[in-house]
Amino acid sequence: MLTRRNAKQSQRNSADQSLSEFNSSSMTHGSNQSVYHHNQHMDDSEMMMDEQDYSQYQMGFPEEDEMVEGMMTPRAVHQCNVCNKIFVSYKGLQQHAVIHTDQKPFRCDICSKSFRFKSNLFEHRSVHTGFTPHACPYCGKTCRLKGNLKKHLRTHVTTKEELEAAWRPFASNRRPPADIPDDAIVLRGAGGPYYTPPPRPKKKKLGLGEPEHWVDKLRRGDLLPQVELEDKIRRLEDTIFNNMSLERWGNLFEIAKSIAFETHDCPVCKSQFMTRMDCVSHHTLEHENHREGLEFFCEKCYRPFADEASYNQHMSYHTRVSSLIETGEIVPQPADPEILVPTNDEFQMLFGANFGQQMMEPQLI
């Protein structure tokens, strides 16, 4: 094995041998070419070429960074083939593609409400937990959603600059949109799902036999307890007696409407409403084109049924009532029942003379 000194000596010998071969080949190159020999009296400094003169013979080899930049292929970006929005990564296109579908893969474990994005599910969970993580730095008020906190901050500041300064600690830390190069290659595509969608279970429709379903609704407080009519009237009387701001009959009727004699559930999202009209209005606006799973649906009661047998049994009740009305066995009550108007003496006894005069004005009845 050669030592380091022997290796250097061998490299020096090979260099001298190459130089001698070059000189011999130059001398015998041709008779027409002049051969210049080294003058023994020439100083070594004269043999050295000036650095400035030598620079003109250097070849312009590009630097490493210049080679990489020149040899790089144009960057590819991804464009949605539905709305033409451009994303710098395919992952971003996949996350965006769910907007153009009806898929809501992220479901709440408590109320089974579904969302398109996981961030929306995280915000929704605070409805059940009561967690209010966003606190106002001025008054300490806490908010469930960050957007509500920004609205609240406007009550403490007067200018836009102050609002931006107060909102800066709570602002999102997402990266700003990236600039798209001019020579970028645009790849159009649908993106496909970013996740593996689980099999969507069919929603269990309301039926007559499934006690577990009704027990769950009772535990969640979806069903109101059974209250006697006398208790409901007593609550209405207490509301009237404790509310001294009544001035018109219309106000009294509005208060009476708030008593929930019966609730109606939306057949799609199971939201509760006090009246059938509110339930129908909600279903028309929020679920206009959603008729999936409503094969056995009563339009009169606005309720779905689990199977055809339950639906037919329910519809037979409507048929029976209609036949009883046609035969005169049942007399339908008017839509607007008669109102028992108290006398002036009764109003004066309850609220005083001035209040009784206001309530008994003919144009307000």
Swiss-Prot record:
Disruption phenotype: RNAi-mediated knockdown causes ectopic expression of gcy-5 in the ASEL gustatory neuron. It is found in: Nucleus speckle. One of its GO terms (cellular component) is nucleus. Residues 8-36 have a biased composition (Polar residues). It holds the Pfam family zf-C2H2. A zinc finger (C2H2-type) spans 78-100, 106-128, 134-156, 264-287, 296-318. One of its GO terms (biological process) is positive regulation of gene expression. PROSITE patterns: ZINC_FINGER_C2H2_1 (PS00028), ZINC_FINGER_C2H2_2 (PS50157). Residues 1-36 are annotated as: Disordered. The keyword Repeat applies. One of its GO terms (molecular function) is zinc ion binding. SUPFAM superfamilies: beta-beta-alpha zinc fingers (SSF57667). Keywords: Metal-binding, Nucleus, Repeat, Transcription, Transcription regulation, Zinc, Zinc-finger. InterPro entries: Znf_C2H2_sf, Znf_C2H2_type. Its main location: nucleus. Involved in transcriptional regulation. Required to specify left-right asymmetry of the ASE gustatory neurons, probably acting upstream of microRNA lsy-6. Involved in maintaining the distinction between somatic and germ cells, perhaps acting by repressing germ cell-specific genes in somatic cells. This is Zinc finger protein lsy-2.
